[in-house]
Each structure stands twice: as C-alpha cells, then as structure tokens.
A protein has these predicted regions:
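N-terminal secretory signal peptides that target proteins for export/translocation
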Residues: 1-9
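Bacterial N-terminal signal peptides
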Residues: 9-23
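Sec/Tat signal peptide C-region and signal peptidase I cleavage site
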Residues: 25-29
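Core segments of small alpha/beta cavity-forming domains
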Residues: 30-83, 170-174, 178-188
Length: 188
C-alpha cells in the first residue's frame, strides 16, 4: 500500500526535476553540438585541462568527449601554465570549410614538470597552439593536435601536494617537497 506521503514526495521530486530540465536550456545540450560555436569545445577542453582533468585516468574521461581520439599516450611531462586565451571570434580562426576550422589558443607557459624525476624546468614563454576542430556526427571534435597536459600552476601545486601525502618513500617525499616549493615560487 502506497501512502499519500510517498506519492506526494514522488510528485514533488518529479516537479523539481522538470523545473531543472526546463530551466537549464542549453545546459543539457549535447557537449560540442554542431549548433554551438566550435570555440566552445576548444574552450571547455582547455579549461578542463587547465584544472588538471588529464592528470589521471579517471578524470581524463571527462575531456574524451571533446576529442577525436579515444586514448592518449602516457605523457612524460606536464606543461605548467598561468593561463590561456581561446580565440572565440571566427575572424581569428582559419576556416577550412563549413565543418572544419583551426582555432588558435595562446598559453602563458611557466615551465614543465617531468613526472619520472619529479623535476621542474622553468621556461617562461607564450605558446600558441592551433586546434583543428571538425564536425563529426553532428558534434564538434578536436582532431589535432594531441599535446601533453597544460595544467594551471595552482592545480599542479595541489597535485604534487596530494602525491606527497600518499608517498611513503622518504627520498621520493623529499623530492616531491622540493618540486612543490619550486612550483610555488615559479614566476612569469
């Protein structure tokens, strides 16, 4: 026997879900829909990468829907950045045809972390990467380039801190501590 409280709760929950769906508009639209700008796909991919989404296998799946490749190689290093700018206006792009464009992204790079040695090489530069985006099955997909993770400085410091907490080997802990300090002090 179903009580009126259960039915009331169910209807209330259903109404909340309906309000959420109706109020979200484009929020529930398929990521990378061809109806939206291809720069939206590039911007979202680069934002997620900046936040460290490609640093581990579990979170790397969040960016996979934006790319034309299924797997990435095991990168030996991570590019550490201060920020990035995506060219959002079509006049700044190279338009190949209706379903293919090249969108430039400018990164403010401060250096690279080499994962095997836990070493940081500071190399301040502005890097321009040209993302080729194609319309594939009614979705925009980044088809090239496949580049190493470009992670923000703060996120990289936190990533190293997490590794330091988990590490049990005293020598590796010391090296991670040095790396964390180098990353904190890195300047433009």
């Amino acid at each position: 026997m179903v009580t009126s409280n259960v039915v009331g709760w169910f209807l209330f929950s259903l109404c909340q879900l309906l309000v959420l769906v109706l109020s979200s508009g484009d929020g529930l639209a398929q990521a990378g829909s061809i109806k939206h700008s291809p720069s939206d796909v590039v911007k979202r991919y680069v934002e997620l990468d900046h936040k460290g989404a490609r640093l581990d296998a579990m979170s790397a799946e969040t960016v996979a829907s934006y790319t034309g490749w299924n797997e990435e190689p095991a990168w030996g290093h991570v590019v550490v950045t201060r920020g990035f700018v995506v060219a959002e206006q079509y006049r700044q792009w190279e338009v190949i045809d209706r379903l293919e464009v090249i969108i430039p992204v400018t990164f403010q790079v401060i250096g690279s972390v080499y994962l095997e040695t836990a070493g940081f090489v500071q190399q301040v530069e502005t890097e321009e990467v040209r993302f080729r985006v194609k319309g594939v099955k009614n979705r925009w997909k980044i088809v090239e380039p496949m580049l190493p993770p470009h992670v923000g400085q703060k996120r990289m410091v936190n990533f190293v801190r997490e590794a330091l907490v988990k590490e049990t080997d005293p020598t590796k802990r010391e090296r991670l501590g040095v790396l964390q300090e180098e990353l904190r002090k890195a300047k433009e």
